[in-house]
């Protein structure tokens, strides 16, 4: 079985094609800067006998043109003979709202609902839908599966996902915590349970997906019971350009003091805050270099980021009562050893003790970073959201075939 995974952003298309016999990628790539003056198309073959790599700078007018280019080059490069041989297409859809708690086979009704949910994810859901619509028109016989970023967190109890606002706002406008990075949190939790030889339905963990966008999740008996992101990905941890948790009155105060519109203030909170807001840079590599040279702003940004993560670990330790593992994943979680070290520093009394030599040289695969005989295991796990989407799509297709 061959499954194509598509992840359409506001100006990009990421894709990965899998052979599901061995869960191995056949190809991966990216179309970026869509709609801009000059875009870029990258496609890499992962076949043993074919290690071709395509890199082209060209105009990519819209998502449909980008998808046509990907389709054309997958056959031209000899990765697949015919696009129609693909058994299913799995789509990452950011916002599933209250409607979608699991992967779903796409039909007209599902497409309408994804469109209706665009109000909660105006940058992402319309792009996700564009990919679905393209395939529906060009290859209507290929089953499409929508896998929602929010679905893993659908198991949160109401006391964790509700905001203490007038209840009618939830009833009318579905204002509540949804959480994101669900596909990543789900994937690494399953990998961790397998690695530690704990049945997944008995596994408890705190998962930290740390990157330019970051979130924490409390996982109890294999299910999400709380997460740091909220109605949107702005809430929670300090991120590359997002502020994370703040007093909501700050929005009104900035608008009054700086004479800004609501739209301008929200742009500041989403795109000019976080690490970038504190030290002028959201590249962790640059921040680390500056910090080591004694740069006060870089040091402050790093310390604020670490402190916020520690607060969430502490809160989720109380929520979960028993914790089997702390999981680090995402671009920073996987690659930023100094961040992992600082997050774990001083948590020994909670049963969390990092083995520094392993942390400094963790390799590229799943690794246990804990000192021997510690109560809670610290795991560094490379996430693979595309594979998780492919696995969920495969499961759906097999169910359809049985029916």
Curated annotation (Swiss-Prot):
Residues at which ATP binds: 14, 209-213, 283-285, 331-335
Compartment(s): Cytoplasm
Pathway where this protein functions: Metabolic intermediate biosynthesis; acetyl-CoA biosynthesis; acetyl-CoA from acetate: step 1/2
Residues the entry annotates as binding Mg(2+): 7, 385
Catalyzed reaction equations: acetate + ATP = acetyl phosphate + ADP
CDD domains: ASKHA_NBD_AcK_PK
Binding site for substrate: 92
GO annotation (BP), single: acetyl-CoA biosynthetic process
Signal peptide limits: none
Top-rank EC class of the record's enzyme: transferase
Pfam families cross-referenced by the UniProt entry: Acetate_kinase
GO cellular component: cytoplasm
Keyword terms, alphabetized: ATP-binding, Cytoplasm, Kinase, Magnesium, Metal-binding, Nucleotide-binding, Transferase
Catalytic residues, chain numbering: 149 (proton donor/acceptor)
Cofactor or coenzyme needed: Mg(2+); Mn(2+)
EC numbers: 2.7.2.1
Database matches in NCBIfam families: ackA
Function: Catalyzes the formation of acetyl phosphate from acetate and ATP. Can also catalyze the reverse reaction.
Name listed for the protein in its UniProt record: Acetate kinase
Originating organism: Helicobacter pylori (strain J99 / ATCC 700824) (Campylobacter pylori J99)
Lineage: Bacteria, Pseudomonadati, Campylobacterota, Epsilonproteobacteria, Campylobacterales
Record gene name: ackA
């Amino acid at each position: 079985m061959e499954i194509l995974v598509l992840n359409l952003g506001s100006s990009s298309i990421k894709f990965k094609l899998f052979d599901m016999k061995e869960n191995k990628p056949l190809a991966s790539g990216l179309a970026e800067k869509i709609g801009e003056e000059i875009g870029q198309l990258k496609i890499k073959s992962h076949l043993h006998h074919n290690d071709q790599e395509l890199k082209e700078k060209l105009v990519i007018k819209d998502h449909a043109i980008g998808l046509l280019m990907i389709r054309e080059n997958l056959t031209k490069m000899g990765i697949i003979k015919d696009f129609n041989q693909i058994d299913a297409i799995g789509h990452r859809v950011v916002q599933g709202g209250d409607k979608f708690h699991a992967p779903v086979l796409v039909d007209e009704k599902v497409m309408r609902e994804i469109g209706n949910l665009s109000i909660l994810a105006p940058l992402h859901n319309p792009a996700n839908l564009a990919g679905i619509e393209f395939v529906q028109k060009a290859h209507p016989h290929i089953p499409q599966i929508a896998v929602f970023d929010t679905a893993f967190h659908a198991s949160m109890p109401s006391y964790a996902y509700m905001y203490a606002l007038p209840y009618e706002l939830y009833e009318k406008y579905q204002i509540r915590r949804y959480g994101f990075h669900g596909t990543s949190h789900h994937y690494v939790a399953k990998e961790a349970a397998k690695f530690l030889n704990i049945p997944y339905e008995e596994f408890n963990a705190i998962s930290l997906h740390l990157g330019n966008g970051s979130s924490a999740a409390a996982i109890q008996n294999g299910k999400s019971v709380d997460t740091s992101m909220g109605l949107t990905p702005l809430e929670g941890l300090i991120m590359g350009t997002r502020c994370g948790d703040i007093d909501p009155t700050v929005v009104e105060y900035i608008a009054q003091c700086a004479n800004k519109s609501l739209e301008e203030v929200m742009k500041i909170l989403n795109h000019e805050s976080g690490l970038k807001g504190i030290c002028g840079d959201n590249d962790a590599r640059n921040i680390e270099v500056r910090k080591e040279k004694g740069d006060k702003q870089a040091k402050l940004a790093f310390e604020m980021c670490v402190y916020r993560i520690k607060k969430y670990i502490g809160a989720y330790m109380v929520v979960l009562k028993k914790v089997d593992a702390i999981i680090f994943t995402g671009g920073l979680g996987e690659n930023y050893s100094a961040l992992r070290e600082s997050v774990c520093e001083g948590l020994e009394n909670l049963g969390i003790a990092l083995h520094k030599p392993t942390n400094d040289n963790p390799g590229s695969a799943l690794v246990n970073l804990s000192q021997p005989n510690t109560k809670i295991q610290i795991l560094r796990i490379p996430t693979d959201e595309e594979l998780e989407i492919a696995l969920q799509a495969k499961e759906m297709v097999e169910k359809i075939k049985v029916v």
